[in-house]
Amino acid sequence: MTKELFLEIGTEEIPAGFLPKAMAEMEGLIRKELDNARIAFGEVKAMATPRRLALVVSQVAGQQADAEITAMGPAKKVAFNEDGTPTRAGEGFARGQGVEPSALSIVVTEKGEYVAVTKKETGVPTVGLLGEILPRLINNISFKKSMRWGDLDVRFARPVHWIVALFDGIVVPFSFGNIESGTMSRGHRFMANTSFPVRDFTHYLDECERHFVIPDPAKRKEIIRREIHRVAKAAGGRLLPDEGLLEQVTYLVEYPSAVHGTFSAEFLVVPREVLITSMREHQRYFSLVDDNGKLLPGFITINNTLTEDPSVVVKGNERVLRARLSDARFFFDEDKKVPLENRVESLKSVLYQAKLGTSYEKMERFRALAEGVAEELQPGLKEKVSQAATLCKADLVTGMVGEFPEVQGIMGREYAFLQGIDPGVANAIAEHYLPTQAGGELPASDIGAFVSIADKLDTICGCFSVGLIPTGSADPYALRRAALGIINIIVAKGYALQLTTLVSKALARLEGKLTRKKEEVFGDVMDFFQGRFVNLMTDRFPADVVDAVVAVSFDDLVDTAAKIEALAVFKKRPDFEPLAVAFKRVCNIVKGPVVVVGVNELDFEEDAEGTLHRAYHSVAGTVAAKVAERDYLAALTQIATLKGAVDDFFDNVMVMAEDERVRNNRLALLQEIKGLFRDIADFAKITA
């Protein structure tokens, strides 16, 4: 008979950012614990509010499954004498396992023969095991920061005040710190600050809502979404979509309600991004726009309580926002007094990184790289690229960015517009930070893209040069994001750039800063880029296709991506599997790089040799032309016509003939075949 397991951990307010990860961990931990304990179970679901983490598991078996347990003992030669009688070691092992020596069995392992005992272990009632599992689960939930409280020897995100632990409606007894598990939960801190008993999960949800708590974040999110759209419409505007803020406020409240507030229209002279950022980042307010997308002087905030007179709450919110926007207006007015060009020199006093110098030094390095990219791809843009690179970090020393770091680049663009700087240059100042996240918006202009590539490349090469290499989950300089940004820009824009050349130029600019050998840094950076590229491509294409292409070419990212896409399409052909098998045989016999050796038709001894040689010459020219045009699908289609001749060759020809001259000629023939696809993919890596 299956039963329901329910756990609630009641706490002081946990930071919103901690909760989604904690929920995922709870689900993973309980699955692992129940699996390890041989306890069958059904659906697992975690929930969270700022003051509670809850977990429900359905269809939990009432009893642990039986199992056969094998205990390994000493080696056979240690456990038994030559005459088969047990030694003292054998007797001791048997005694420790509670069996007679005659019950010992022999198990053959990689290390030799060992004695063992196989015993049937009868499952015990689940409830007894849960008393150990649940406190261990609570203790194993990890947080970015945890704390101790009182003189207790436990840690959690915030002090724990109550624990509900039920199995089939019965308390699972255990303690965590000084808290004993029980049946009593608590309501909303301000609207229903009382305890209430819980019978099961359904009863828990009902009682929570009666006590002004909505435990399920998905339900809270939909309530908030519905409410903010309703309030926005009532206020005569539309909500500016912000899924990130919606996710955040979902975990800030237990019982959400939305209210509308306003601010003075005089603040609309401040760039909209600053207003939006101030409301979102500092106050957690949603912004409002009109039907044309123009920012309105209003906001929506989510309260954690219902109030009889919302105006009191609104006035408080408006007062706080007015102070923030007044600061923004002051910084904006002051910053406009100093041209961006005049601020560049101040970057010499801004430390970028202790071993890599100032922000001014960094700017000089990536400006040269950006100019080089422009020279190679669009020489006519070089002057504007140089200007954009020079100015793109200047807003770091403005008052506005000092107060609102999130608007770096954006303010540089706005000040550039106000100062009459070329619009392309102004936009590039903001664009050079893009993309700011995986799958994020890319620079729209080539000027912005060139500067973005250069800045990110200098960051990566600089950090690798001084040993600041990402490890595990630690990536303080966001180098993985920077590498993916470069890759996405180059591939999306179709830029014909050689990655090896870019990295070499970036490292050359870092002379005098390197604390490692340049050759080692170069190799590490290229491996780093390749890893990110492979990860990115395997999200869209089969892993074996990506590996096969990257194995033969990686320097030109656009070209490599085109080959991967072509091979992925080619692999979907119904005849691909036997085709791949045939070409894998070629690759496996002719290993290593293709060596051009002439094929002598006079040394052919079998008809299949001549047939394959003629087939090769019939397509070689077309394949070469299609490869030159980067029409790799057409090239592969031509190569595929050789399958019959290749199969006939392997069926009728012994490649490794005893006669060295004949053998080498046959190998040379296979080298020709391999040479057709050597620059597209290594078919040996294809999973046929």
From Swiss-Prot:
Record carries keyword Ion transport: no
Family: Belongs to the class-II aminoacyl-tRNA synthetase family.
Principal EC category: ligase
EC number from the UniProt entry: 6.1.1.14
Protein's UniProt name: Glycine--tRNA ligase beta subunit
Catalytic activity, reaction form: tRNA(Gly) + glycine + ATP = glycyl-tRNA(Gly) + AMP + diphosphate
Keywords: Aminoacyl-tRNA synthetase, ATP-binding, Cytoplasm, Ligase, Nucleotide-binding, Protein biosynthesis
GO cellular component labels: cytosol
InterPro entries, sorted: DALR_anticod-bd, Gly-tRNA-synth_bsu, Gly-tRNA-synth_heterodimer
Chief localization: cytoplasm
